[in-house]
Amino acid sequence: MRHQLRIPLLSKPADQRKALLRGLTTQLIREGRVTTTKARAKALRNETERMISLAKEGTLAARRRAIGYIYDKKLVHSLFEKAQERYGDRNGGYTRIVRTVARKGDNAQMAIIELV
Protein backbone atom coordinates (compact mmCIF):
# COMPACT_ATOMS: atom_id res chain seq x y z
CA MET A 1 0.00 0.00 0.00
CA ARG A 2 1.55 3.28 -1.14
CA HIS A 3 0.68 6.10 1.23
CA GLN A 4 1.20 9.70 0.15
CA LEU A 5 2.02 8.87 -3.47
CA ARG A 6 4.19 11.77 -4.62
CA ILE A 7 4.92 10.84 -8.23
CA PRO A 8 2.46 9.29 -10.64
CA LEU A 9 3.55 5.84 -11.77
CA LEU A 10 2.06 6.22 -15.28
CA SER A 11 1.69 2.42 -15.52
CA LYS A 12 5.38 2.00 -16.34
CA PRO A 13 8.49 0.61 -14.64
CA ALA A 14 10.78 3.21 -13.09
CA ASP A 15 13.35 3.26 -15.90
CA GLN A 16 10.73 3.65 -18.64
CA ARG A 17 8.91 6.33 -16.64
CA LYS A 18 12.13 8.30 -16.16
CA ALA A 19 13.01 8.04 -19.86
CA LEU A 20 9.50 9.11 -20.86
CA LEU A 21 9.60 12.18 -18.61
CA ARG A 22 13.11 13.09 -19.76
CA GLY A 23 12.02 12.91 -23.39
CA LEU A 24 8.86 14.93 -22.80
CA THR A 25 10.79 17.54 -20.80
CA THR A 26 13.34 17.89 -23.59
CA GLN A 27 10.59 18.24 -26.18
CA LEU A 28 8.65 20.78 -24.10
CA ILE A 29 11.69 22.99 -23.59
CA ARG A 30 12.58 22.74 -27.29
CA GLU A 31 9.10 23.25 -28.78
CA GLY A 32 7.35 25.29 -26.08
CA ARG A 33 4.24 23.09 -26.04
CA VAL A 34 3.44 19.37 -26.03
CA THR A 35 0.16 17.51 -26.49
CA THR A 36 -0.02 14.46 -24.23
CA THR A 37 -2.34 12.77 -21.75
CA LYS A 38 -3.47 14.71 -18.69
CA ALA A 39 -1.64 12.41 -16.25
CA ARG A 40 1.63 12.70 -18.18
CA ALA A 41 1.22 16.47 -18.40
CA LYS A 42 0.84 16.73 -14.62
CA ALA A 43 3.95 14.59 -14.08
CA LEU A 44 5.83 16.56 -16.73
CA ARG A 45 5.01 19.87 -15.04
CA ASN A 46 7.08 18.95 -11.95
CA GLU A 47 10.16 17.95 -13.96
CA THR A 48 10.02 20.96 -16.29
CA GLU A 49 9.64 23.43 -13.45
CA ARG A 50 12.58 21.81 -11.68
CA MET A 51 14.76 22.27 -14.80
CA ILE A 52 13.70 25.91 -15.24
CA SER A 53 14.45 26.59 -11.57
CA LEU A 54 17.92 25.11 -12.09
CA ALA A 55 18.38 27.37 -15.12
CA LYS A 56 17.37 30.42 -13.10
CA GLU A 57 19.90 29.43 -10.45
CA GLY A 58 22.57 29.53 -13.14
CA THR A 59 25.44 27.89 -11.26
CA LEU A 60 27.85 25.41 -12.78
CA ALA A 61 26.50 22.63 -10.55
CA ALA A 62 22.94 23.41 -11.66
CA ARG A 63 24.02 23.35 -15.31
CA ARG A 64 25.65 19.94 -14.84
CA ARG A 65 22.51 18.56 -13.18
CA ALA A 66 20.41 19.84 -16.10
CA ILE A 67 22.81 18.32 -18.66
CA GLY A 68 22.43 15.00 -16.85
CA TYR A 69 18.65 15.15 -17.22
CA ILE A 70 17.90 16.87 -20.55
CA TYR A 71 18.94 14.90 -23.62
CA ASP A 72 20.19 17.83 -25.75
CA LYS A 73 23.26 19.65 -24.42
CA LYS A 74 22.80 22.69 -26.69
CA LEU A 75 19.23 23.01 -25.48
CA VAL A 76 20.49 23.20 -21.89
CA HIS A 77 22.85 26.05 -22.76
CA SER A 78 20.10 28.01 -24.53
CA LEU A 79 17.73 27.39 -21.59
CA PHE A 80 20.29 28.74 -19.13
CA GLU A 81 20.83 31.85 -21.29
CA LYS A 82 17.12 32.67 -21.67
CA ALA A 83 15.65 31.54 -18.33
CA GLN A 84 16.78 34.47 -16.21
CA GLU A 85 15.32 37.12 -18.52
CA ARG A 86 12.16 35.15 -19.29
CA TYR A 87 11.32 33.87 -15.79
CA GLY A 88 13.41 36.16 -13.57
CA ASP A 89 10.54 37.66 -11.56
CA ARG A 90 8.39 34.52 -11.47
CA ASN A 91 8.65 32.08 -8.55
CA GLY A 92 7.32 28.87 -10.06
CA GLY A 93 4.32 28.36 -12.31
CA TYR A 94 6.37 28.26 -15.50
CA THR A 95 3.95 25.92 -17.29
CA ARG A 96 0.27 25.92 -18.13
CA ILE A 97 -1.90 22.82 -18.65
CA VAL A 98 -4.95 23.19 -20.90
CA ARG A 99 -7.36 20.27 -21.20
CA THR A 100 -8.45 19.30 -24.70
CA VAL A 101 -10.84 16.76 -26.19
CA ALA A 102 -10.46 13.09 -25.34
CA ARG A 103 -8.35 10.90 -27.62
CA LYS A 104 -10.43 9.06 -30.19
CA GLY A 105 -8.93 5.59 -29.85
CA ASP A 106 -9.15 4.98 -26.12
CA ASN A 107 -11.01 8.06 -24.80
CA ALA A 108 -8.00 9.13 -22.72
CA GLN A 109 -8.12 12.66 -21.32
CA MET A 110 -5.70 14.77 -23.33
CA ALA A 111 -4.01 18.04 -22.42
CA ILE A 112 -1.66 20.59 -23.90
CA ILE A 113 1.17 21.65 -21.62
CA GLU A 114 2.98 24.84 -22.60
CA LEU A 115 5.60 27.17 -21.22
CA VAL A 116 4.22 30.47 -19.94
Curated annotation (Swiss-Prot):
InterPro entries: Ribosomal_bL17, Ribosomal_bL17_sf. Belongs to the bacterial ribosomal protein bL17 family. GO terms for cellular component: cytosolic large ribosomal subunit. Keywords: Ribonucleoprotein, Ribosomal protein. It comes from Prochlorococcus marinus (strain MIT 9515). GO terms for molecular function: structural constituent of ribosome. This is Large ribosomal subunit protein bL17. The gene is rplQ. The keyword Endoplasmic reticulum does not apply. GO terms for biological process: translation. It comes from the Bacteria. Part of the 50S ribosomal subunit. Contacts protein L32. SUPFAM superfamilies: Prokaryotic ribosomal protein L17 (SSF64263).
